[in-house]
Curated annotation (Swiss-Prot):
Residues 30-57 are intravirion. Interacts with host TNFRSF1A, RIPK1 and IRAK1; these interactions interfere with host NF-kappa-B activation at the level of receptor complexes. Interacts with host protein UBQLN4. GO terms for biological process: symbiont-mediated suppression of host NF-kappaB cascade. GO terms for cellular component: host cell plasma membrane; membrane; virion membrane. This is Small hydrophobic protein. It comes from Mumps virus (strain Takahashi). Plays a role in the inhibition of the host NF-kappa-B pathway. This inhibition occurs at the receptor level, by preventing the signaling of TNFR1 as well as IL-1R and TLR3. It comes from the Viruses. The chain crosses the membrane at residues 9-29.
Amino acid sequence: MPAIQPPLYPTFLLLILLSLIITLYAWIISTITYKTAMRHAALYQRSFFRWSFDHSL
């Protein structure tokens, strides 16, 4: 057995942990962005509807 070879199991475990953390981070960010985007979209839609209604009269 070569002594230079790094232990595979801890590296594999670290890789899995890292990917899990990255996935969780991305999911949280996308959820927050989606919620704020939906809120802003509702706000803009409401104001735009009011503006078009005022200008149509």
